[in-house]
Amino acid sequence: MNIITLLTEQAQIRPHQPAIIDFPQRKRRVLTFVELEQAATHSAGLFQQSGLQVGDVVLIFQPMSAELYIALAGIFRLGLVAMFIDPGQGLRHIAQCCASQPPKAVLASNIVHRLLALSPTLRRIPLKFAVEELAVQAKSVPKFAPLGRRAWQTHRQTVQHPHYFSAQASDPALLTFTSGSTGHPKAALRSHDFLMSQHQVIAECLALTTGSVSLATMPIVLLSNLAQGITSVIPAGDLRSPGKTDPALLATLIQAENVSSTVASPALLERLADYCQTQQQTLPSLCKIFIGGAPVFPKTLQRLQQVASHAEIVTIYGSTEAEPMAKIAFNQVQMADVQAMLAGGGVLVGVPVPAIRLAILPDRWGKPLLPMSQSEFECLQCSRGVVGEIVVSGAHVLSGYLHGKGDAESKFRVNGSSWHRTGDAGYLDGQGRLWLMGRCSARLQDERGKTYPFAVECALSQLPAVQRSAFLSHNARRVLVVQITDASASLCERLKGVLFPFRKRVQPIIAPTLDLTKLKAWVAWAQVDEIRVFKHIPLDVRHNAKVDYPALYKRLERWDGFFHHLGCFIGGFKHALGLLKH
């Protein structure tokens, strides 16, 4: 079944209900379900008129907006494949992605097209569509488009394509990319059947009321909202950087549009909670808050509950290849669970969703797993409470990557069925709930035993003075890196003696152990050798919430190199002074 049929059904059931409310150029715009359906038939007509055929790939560089979903609906209707690449990864990354599945067309704004002209790979794409904001309700169409590009607004003048491609289960629909352990992009190709299964699982997981209003910050969730008849509000701003969103705008928008639910990154929701608490403001319309995409610590959940006291706050665990995997409501977290998290037990993410099969295998990340029988698989699984690698299988779990690139490191088979290796370490407790311990590749293992970073990050997250932390092995030493909050004046006072005159140019400060003994004692079980304080700990680009450990390693190396050269300079200077005295 073609995923577009669900949108067509909603246009018939609730034609005049708003499907998308967005704010191009800060102006409120409403697109109803029937308007979305009509625009989709026109966009499909434009693609067909341009010569695109079933199976052709359309590369999209377009932020969350009405235009994005009109384009997607037209693409799915015609049986084309939508390709998404993160432009923030650079032109080399884009070229690698396009080489794996060359697109026949690219859709982007005129501004983005000018930047893409720097890429020989993108210049070779035959068809180029230029999107301008306010295209949905534009009363006139520009008489010209930039050289070599076709104005997206002309879809309003093309003949409608009312029929949709009758998709088979395996027909491709959506192509995205994720980085493997080698750094080369892996292509995740989702079929119409996969998108249908994922929508069903997301809908069951969120259990939103048809006709309600949801603040949309994640593209795949908005697509599921449309299929379920839920109004999606897209806030103004760049949602690709959730940690930089305007919290005042979000709070105002939630109240003005009577938003009852949202699915968002911890970085976005933390900023919203900060703002509301500072302004002594609450969000009474919110009934459900779903938070995921990065580790969610108890302190964040507590603050959100204070801001939205009537809301059910739910943590969701998932990944690009399997979304969602597990969930837990904050009101289900007991005091004993919080104490376990503070004592190094990791992050509680709840019971696996019914649609997924989840198991814990011994942590052998980096080594391929050979095909095995069901009995061999069951014998290999870890006992309850034992930390290992999380593996999953299900209809909404990606069974393999395009051309098999990346399958060896992250896929294996049990009785012929595909299983996905998440690369995350965790364990199942006695109640069958999943606890996360961090990335398998980030584990610390030495003569003192094995420790995972999330255990330390979660424990320190409850301290008011610590905004963020990271735990890693560096030069055979267990190093704790902390980022302090702006309000932690007492800690800053203790560190005042080690701040350098040029601290604005050099971010990390090595903190004397004696000054941070309480911090070290808080995680005594981690046996920390050294504590360093950073002005900012590097985070992942996508959610702005997960510690970017490779970037942190590089920063530590640069900092150590700086001190090495500084030491050599001081040593040489002292030696020269000694010679002068003689």
Question: Where are these predicted regions, by residue range?
Answer:
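Conserved pre-ATP/AMP-binding loop-to-beta segment of ANL
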Residues: 15-18, 146-177, 184, 205-212
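Conserved AMP-binding/adenylate-forming
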Residues: 29, 44-88
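Conserved AMP-binding A3 loop
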Residues: 30-34, 164-167, 173-197, 231
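Conserved ATP-binding/catalytic segment of the ANL
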Residues: 61, 376-447, 462, 473
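Structural core segment of the AMP-binding/adenylate-forming
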Residues: 77-150, 476, 517
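Conserved AMP-binding/adenylation subdomain of ANL enzymes
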Residues: 81, 195-213, 218-260
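Gly/Ser/Thr-rich phosphate-binding loop
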Residues: 146-147, 151-152, 230, 261-263, ...
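Conserved C-terminal "lid"/linker of ANL adenylate-forming enzymes
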Residues: 517-581
